[in-house]
Amino acid sequence: MAQATISITVNGEAKEVEATTTGVELFAEDKNIIAVKINGENRDLYTPLNDGDTVDPIALDSEDGLAIMRHSATHVMAQAVQEVYPNAKLGVGPVIKDGFYYDFQVDQPFTPNDLKDIEKRMQRIIKSSQSFRRRSVTEEEALKEEADQPFKIELIEDKEAHLDPAAATEISEKELSFYDNVDRDGNVVWKDLCRGPHLPNTRYIKAFKIERSAAAYWRGSEKNPTMQRVYGTAWATKEDLKAYQTRLEEAAKRDHRKLGAEMDLFSFPDEIGPGLAVFHPKGAAVINAMEDYSREMHRKHHYSFVQTPHITKGGLYETSGHLHWYKDGMYPPMHLDEEKDADGNITKPGADYYLKPMNCPMHNLIFKSRQRSYRELPLRLFEFGTVYRYEKSGEVHGLTRVRGLTQDDSHIYCTREQMKDELTSLLTFVLNLLKDFGLTDFYLELSTKDPNKYVGSDEIWEEATNTLAEVAKESNLELVDDPCGAAFYGPKISVQARDAIGRTWQVSTIQLDFNLPERFQLEYIAKDGTHQRPVMIHRALFGSIERFFAVLLEHYAGAFPAWLAPVQVLGVPVADEFAPHLAGFVKSLEDEMVRCEIDYSDDRFGKKIRNASKSKVPFILIVGEEDMNNNAVSFRFRDGSQLNGVPVDTAREQILTVIKKRVQVNSADDFNAAVAE
């Protein structure tokens, strides 16, 4: 006889329910519940429950709920595409940050009008209130159903497809399943290979937008066919969608590539190649200010500065393991030093040299260059080291993803007893320095071992991971797990910073490493005279100078605080006869290492002021007849407010004070507050 009731836990409360109960019945009164979490796994709302299950609701406007709704939107989009283009072949349709995409193989690239047609068809499908229904299938059944879909067949036959993050939306390691789109009459009108979960019904997709299309290689490989990737976004409400679109508009205004060109900061000449930035004088001024302050703070925290070459013999990266684990991200080798006699016979074998992708192996050689004592530990080595990483040309993006980058790279060698305290002080140092650059809203991410890509023992990884987790929790910042996200040599904490418009950027990383000291046979003489392995900590505060520059440029929308601004003071004389007085004052600022310019152009004064305002300079100094007669200058700030007739000695001290304090000043009120403190 079938069991009449089962015992389950709902929202932490024990309940007895009928054995046929699903989430539909449990949460019938709350129409915002679109799925359930059963024993920690997201499942469809109508999934059968078993005795002993723990069940929690998933609301549409929650993080999990939005992901489920966006994935359902990919199915609606794919259905719409196949209705408009019946011969379209389906790829994968994963959820991404704030949206989703689906890959299609079609005869011609989609045009903007095509995307409008697809969006209209999606609206029709959503209004038709189709239900999503899951069914499990065997591999044989799946292959039969997808006989005319070559990309789906590839996923079905690939036993490791579930390890691919994009393909994992389609393929589960446990079983294969389809989702049928069922109309009101109970007819299956469309289907897709998918692991789920999905919405109960298309009508829950209340606010969506098709955004754009782009070419993309199938499964990210240049060896595979080119697909058309259609991007979209979906939100719980129309208000949320509108807010997202507003954020996109603001982000477009702040795009560092756009600002970089407008402000004459940097460029990417075709003659040099993709992902290789050239910083112009104004951009280099910002870089220098960033690096100078970083150097100052590292000296105060007892770091030893080192410098290493840009290329090295390949054997170094054999020792470190990079050639095994990271070769695809390295530039091809240069075979050098080979010598031949007159007959072409090799008399001296050459060696493969590589552009360095990372600084850590060279820092290990510095540690190893002589015997080390426990009295020297912790030893903190620091370098602004330029590294080179091969990114596909289609994947480079402004300064945030480049091929040549400079890291503020530190490697710290300490004892296991020092490890916890060193990590704690290091995280504090990192967060304080980021705050000095104007980033104040953080959370931490803990990246743990990828079981398919790591070196070292499980015990060592567990110790390293637990120590990092403990330090992260003691910071009182939010800690988010990143399963399988660590590099092959150790777990890491990354600092995620939210910018002025709420976007999240990964900035600093702190990585614990028990592995490389073993591979390099690093040792120190302990207090008892024994030889011991040091613990190694990798740390990049900026991540890379280029990326952090881009983050700051977008965070401030080009209006850097005075200490970072490429031009800190711009002088604008009301007329030519007042220029000498202004030039004398500007010279006194330049003697204090303030970055200044004067507008000597023939433009009218009004145009000069408009041009100066567009330049985002923190201090525009104006000199007219009254200013000259009173040995004064007048300030104009970014918001248009002014302070008139400030004596030159006072003005000089106030400008230097604001620069020294590293505060943001956009108005006369900001300025007065900064100099009054």
From Swiss-Prot:
UniProtKB keywords: Aminoacyl-tRNA synthetase, ATP-binding, Cytoplasm, Ligase, Metal-binding, Nucleotide-binding, Protein biosynthesis, RNA-binding, tRNA-binding, Zinc
CDD domains according to UniProt: TGS_ThrRS, ThrRS_anticodon, ThrRS_core
Cofactor: binding comment: Binds 1 zinc ion per subunit.
Endpoints of the signal sequence: none
Region (Catalytic): 255-561
Residue pairs linked by disulfide bridges in the UniProt entry: none
Pfam families registered for this protein in UniProt: HGTP_anticodon, tRNA-synt_2b, tRNA_SAD
EC code(s) of this entry: 6.1.1.3
Record InterPro entries: aa-tRNA-synt_IIb (IPR002314), aa-tRNA-synth_II (IPR006195), aa-tRNA-synth_II/BPL/LPL (IPR045864), Anticodon-bd (IPR004154), Anticodon-bd_dom_sf (IPR036621), TGS (IPR004095), Thr-tRNA-ligase_IIa (IPR002320), Thr/Ala-tRNA-synth_IIc_edit (IPR018163)
Family matches, as SUPFAM superfamilies: Class II aaRS ABD-related (SSF52954), Class II aaRS and biotin synthetases (SSF55681), ThrRS/AlaRS common domain (SSF55186)
Subcellular location, record wording: Cytoplasm
Molecular function terms, GO-annotated: ATP binding; metal ion binding; threonine-tRNA ligase activity; tRNA binding
Reaction catalysed by this enzyme: tRNA(Thr) + L-threonine + ATP = L-threonyl-tRNA(Thr) + AMP + diphosphate + H(+)
Cofactor(s) this protein cannot do without: Zn(2+)
Primary location: cytoplasm
PROSITE patterns the UniProt entry points to: AA_TRNA_LIGASE_II, TGS
A GO cellular-component term linked to this record: cytoplasm
Function of the molecule: Catalyzes the attachment of threonine to tRNA(Thr) in a two-step reaction: L-threonine is first activated by ATP to form Thr-AMP and then transferred to the acceptor end of tRNA(Thr). Also edits incorrectly charged L-seryl-tRNA(Thr).
Family annotation (HAMAP family): Thr_tRNA_synth
Quaternary structure, from the entry: Homodimer.
Family the entry assigns: Belongs to the class-II aminoacyl-tRNA synthetase family.
Name of the protein this chain belongs to: Threonine--tRNA ligase
Organism whose genome encodes this protein: Bifidobacterium longum (strain NCC 2705)
